[in-house]
Design a protein with these regions (language model features):
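N-terminal, charged/glycine-rich beta-strand/loop interface patches
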Residues: 1-135, 142-147, 151-156, 160-174, ...
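Residue-level detector of conserved catalytic or cofactor/ligand-binding positions
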Residues: 194-202
Length: 202
């Protein structure tokens, strides 16, 4: 599969498939495709449907199989960016819930519960996120623009809650309160901030 991401405000990812290749997408994500694409709708079982209910994704997903070489395009549902993520076993990624757009067939998504309850209650990203695993390329949609940082082991970054789009599964998210009453009530910022850090090797 080869792809190109086009457009600025409402981007589209155009995937060029060889015969027999398959793409998976959320319902309603497909924008246009060649007639050689065969569509099938599947929920993936009761467990996966319930998981998608928690993570804010559509309950059913569509698969598109190329009966011949052809293209299929998936469009973002809001202004922002489409980001391509390559995942492999041991290289999983945590993304915003409902950020999944489309992927190759060997990519899997599952509900990811933040282990620290306080991070879910006070963090802008919520208690429930989405974990992307498997093997292949996944496309996610993010509202607004993105800035990427590569943290080293032990390095930390404080982020205004709600601005975290995705992180490697090796990262951990904790929540810290803004110190000082004056800062809390007069600072004009949120009361809680996300602290992202890399886990130390075990």
């Amino acid at each position: 599969m080869k792809y190109e991401i086009v457009g600025d405000t409402l981007p589209v990812v155009i995937c060029h498939l060889n015969k027999g290749e398959k793409m998976i997408s959320d319902s309603g994500a497909m924008a246009w495709m060649d007639p050689c694409m065969k569509m099938e709708t599947n929920g993936g079982g009761a467990g996966k449907i319930i998981g998608r209910m928690f993570s804010g994704e559509t309950l059913f997903r569509n698969s598109y199989t190329a009966n011949e070489d052809g293209l299929i395009a998936f469009a973002s549902s809001f202004p922002g960016k489409i980001v391509a993520i390559d995942v492999d076993p041991g290289k999983e990624v945590i993304i915003q819930k409902s950020a999944f757009l489309a992927s190759e067939e060997n990519v899997e998504t599952s509900v990811f519960f933040n282990k620290k309850f306080s991070s879910g209650i006070f963090g802008g990203e919520g208690f429930i996120l989405t974990k992307v695993s498997g093997h292949g390329t996944c496309f996610i949609e993010i509202d607004g623009s993105t800035v990427e940082y590569n943290l080293l082991p032990g390095q930390q970054m404080v982020i205004d809650t709600g601005y975290l789009a995705m992180m490697d599964a090796t990262c951990k998210m904790d929540i810290q309160s803004v110190p000082g009453l004056k800062n809390k009530f007069l600072g004009g910022e949120v009361l809680f901030l996300s602290l992202i850090h890399i886990s130390e090797p075990t």
